[in-house]
């Protein structure tokens, strides 16, 4: 499976912090925001990743992540000139995708924690069609909502006034190659954008849409506003301080996946300046 991280847009909800930088380069506690979705993909076996960003941010992402080789992955960069909606990512990344591979799309400001088994099951067993996830929320009318029976989707609604369930669809999706044709044939909504809900509904009409319910205790954070960015940082800090582990650490994730060797991790650590992050990575080798 290949992966796409969507980091386009203007980050207007985080103005003025995003005047000089891309939203996904802002810190969520102790690391750049993009580290979190990148780690989600790596933890679930994805090693071929496309980062789609706006025209002004490519060089900064390349400075941060390079071609991914130090992490044992391959990172490709493509540009979304205007924020025309999530589905445009599949059109932009058409040359990156292969017919025989599924693709995982994760939004660059989304953070997931505590659902590793469910996500890994969904990634490993993905064959065709599309897979979304259901996350229980208190206020489903603010989200795209999935009504389900087991792993079968009954309906999809976008910000319904009277939701049929209290399960929102977070910004992580699995699709087969057909998603490109579906995205290419979409028409903009009243907002003037292509809508990911319309892509999902196309699979629902074809009876090829599955859903995995994220279990109780799973954390899904959207760090796309000033308040949610602060809350996300506070949550990550609390977990890391209490448990002594890092959330969203791609170096640790890729080492655990076997993408880099112990020698390669040591070399990577050597290139990091003296800091708490370096100490954490060093302790991975020290205490294993």
Per-segment meaning from a language model:
Residues 25, 146-148:
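A structural signal for short hydrophobic beta-strand segments in well-ordered beta-sheet cores
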Residues 255-288:
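Generic C-terminus detector
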Residues 2-5, 13-16, 26-27, 31-107, ...:
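Conserved N-terminal catalytic core of the sugar/cofactor nucleotidyltransferase
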Residues 1, 46-47, 72-74, 99-102, ...:
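Short coil/turn connectors at secondary-structure junctions
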Residues 114-141:
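Conserved donor-nucleotide/metal-binding helix-loop-beta segment in metal-dependent transferases, i.e.
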Residues 104, 120-124, 152-252, 256, ...:
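Catalytic-core segments of class I nucleotidyltransferases/pyrophosphorylases
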């Amino acid at each position: 499976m290949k992966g796409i991280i969507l980091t386009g847009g203007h980050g207007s909800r985080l103005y003025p912090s995003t005047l000089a930088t891309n939203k996904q380069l802002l810190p969520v506690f102790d690391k750049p925001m993009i580290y979190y979705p990148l780690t989600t993909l790596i933890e679930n076996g994805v090693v071929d990743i496309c980062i789609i960003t706006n025209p002004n941010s490519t060089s900064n992402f390349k400075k941060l992540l390079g071609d991914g080789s130090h992490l044992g992955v391959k990172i490709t960069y493509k540009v979304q000139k205007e924020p025309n909606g999530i589905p445009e990512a599949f059109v932009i990344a058409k040359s990156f995708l292969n017919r025989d591979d599924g693709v995982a799309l994760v939004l660059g400001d989304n953070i997931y924690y505590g659902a590793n088994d469910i996500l890994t099951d969904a990634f490993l067993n993905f064959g065709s069609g599309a897979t979304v996830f259901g996350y229980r929320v208190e206020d489903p009318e603010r989200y795209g909502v999935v009504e389900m029976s087991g792993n079968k989707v009954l309906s999809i609604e976008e910000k319904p006034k009277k939701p049929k369930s209290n399960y929102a669809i977070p910004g992580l999706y699995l699709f087969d190659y057909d998603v490109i044709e579906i995205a290419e044939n979409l028409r903009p909504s009243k907002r003037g954008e292509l809508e990911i809900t319309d892509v999902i509904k196309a699979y629902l009409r074809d009876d090829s849409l599955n859903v995995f319910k994220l279990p109780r205790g799973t954390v899904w954070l959207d760090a796309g506003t000033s308040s949610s960015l602060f809350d996300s940082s506070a949550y990550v800090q609390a977990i890391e301080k209490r448990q002594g582990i890092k959330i969203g650490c791609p170096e640790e994730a890729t080492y655990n996946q076997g993408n880099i060797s112990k020698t390669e991790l040591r070399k990577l650590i050597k290139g990091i300046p003296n800091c708490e992050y370096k100490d954490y990575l060093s302790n991975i080798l020290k205490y294993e």
